[in-house]
Curated annotation (Swiss-Prot):
It comes from the Eukaryota. Pfam families: HIM1 (PF08732). This is Protein HIM1. Gene3D superfamilies: NAD(P)-binding Rossmann-like Domain. Keywords: DNA damage, DNA repair. May participate in the control of processing of mutational intermediates appearing during error-prone bypass of DNA damage. GO terms for biological process: DNA repair.
């Protein structure tokens, strides 16, 4: 596929998009408002253009790798926030985002070469004939695509039209221990998606996945929970250390790589006393020192106890629809009983320790002296800052860059 000089394509690898933090990261990376409020990425691309002929096209691809399918029917389309947007500059002029023209809100007809509003496809990926002799693989994927048209104006005469195409591809690989070795094979530059053709009821070759060399940013929010460790009998060190480190090892096949990783608040006492914090400290150190190929940029987020809800929301209706106030009063004891049962069931599913940490984090957030237990921070802020670091303009420094963001800094950034 050939691109014009006004086309820019960015790829992001996201691991842990089913986690509490990862869900928010995925939402943010696919939110147009993240890019129009934080314009360093867009500004950098405009600065590289000496002239603009036609539209400027931004292709944003996010690849999620999960053990099971999530959010396959969810819409990521957002309403553009014209109030809180930031202006951009180009060749001495300052351009402001204007309301979208009516004709641009029309749905684009589906075609193989066009990104569409909320277009959805699914299929499978299998090893190519060129890989004969290697272990075979075959797994399913799903993909959503949607677009926005942004109109930036400088006075009445000058204008820049920017088309933002978002694509999120979810690769469902049940055995997470195989992810590191599969990474360079899947992202070889020749691997094609086999999408399902609804009209002919069969699978046909689709787009090729990019080469791992062309993916410059990886975001990792992998981690263990007590309930998962108990259920799977897999040591917590696998998700907290070995899997993130091995993925980073395969990811750093070139020198221009950025990794954004979420760990945990830490200090010398914690890392020497508790295994969880010791493992997190080892991961941070080894990502910085032990990778065969150094990362150009390593961003470490160290959140404290996070205010947020793991698992699914608990919804119990208080009485039937159109019930009277008196009927609701009589129903209230039954409502409490049902809610209690669902709450206990959900707490057991995600782990009592995890549920307890949620309660503690919410109760100590910004309370005096609470930093002694680790500075609590809303999970939404952790997700936002991780997304922000992933889209920041690449550093121009020659040497490796390490940035550590504390829980307090996360709270203050947003």
């Amino acid at each position: 596929m050939s691109y014009s000089v006004n086309t820019f394509t960015d790829y992001v690898l996201l691991f842990g998009s089913s986690s509490l933090v990862g869900k928010g990261i995925l939402e943010n990376l696919l939110d147009i408002n993240l890019y129009i409020k934080n314009v360093s990425d867009l500004q950098g691309k405009l600065d590289s253009l000496s002239e603009i002929k036609g539209n400027v096209v931004l292709n944003k691809h996010v690849f999620c790798v999960n053990r099971r399918c999530i959010n396959e029917e969810k819409s990521f389309m957002k309403t553009i926030d014209y109030i809180n947007m930031r202006s951009v500059t180009w060749q001495g002029g300052r351009y402001y985002l204007r309301s979208r023209k009516e004709k641009d809100t029309e749905k684009v007809p589906s075609s193989p070469n066009t990104f569409c509003y909320d277009n959805f496809e699914e299929g499978f990926i299998k090893n190519t004939p060129e890989e004969r002799g290697k272990d075979g693989y075959s797994f399913v994927y799903n993909q959503k695509q949607f677009s926005y048209t942004l109109h930036y104006a400088c006075g009445k005469e000058k204008g820049i039209e920017i088309i933002c195409n978002f694509t999120v591809t979810q690769l469902i690989i049940p055995r997470s221990e195989t992810w590191p070795k599969l990474l360079p094979r899947i992202f070889s530059g020749t691997q094609k998606l086999e999408k399902f053709d609804i009209d002919n009821k069969n699978y046909v070759p689709g787009r090729s996945l990019p080469s791992l060399c062309d993916i410059s940013t990886m975001v990792c929010s992998l981690g263990s929970t007590s309930a998962r460790v108990r259920r799977t009998q897999v040591p917590s060190s696998f998700a907290d250390y070995y899997l993130p480190f091995n993925l980073a090892q395969e990811f750093t096949n070139t020198t221009n790589k950025r990794l954004v990783v979420t760990t945990a608040f830490n200090n010398d006492f914690l890392s020497k006393t508790f295994e969880y914090f010791r493992i997190k400290a080892k991961l941070e150190n080894d990502l910085d020192e032990a990778l065969p190929n150094k990362l150009k940029e390593l961003v470490i987020l160290r959140p404290g106890p996070m205010c947020g809800q793991h698992g699914n929301p608990i919804n119990v209706e208080l009485g039937k629809e159109n019930s009277t106030f008196l009927e609701k009063i009589f129903y209230y004891p039954h409502y409490l009983l049902v809610y209690k049962k669902k709450y206990i069931s959900e707490a057991r599913r995600i782990g009592l320790r995890t549920k307890l940490s949620e309660i503690i984090a919410s109760s100590i957030y910004r309370m005096p002296g609470s930093a002694l237990l680790g500075y609590a921070v809303p999970v939404s802020k952790v997700s936002y800052v991780a997304s922000l670091m992933a889209i920041e303009r690449k550093s121009k420094e020659a040497g490796p860059k390490l940035e550590v963001i504390s829980s307090y800094q996360i709270d203050m950034i947003v």
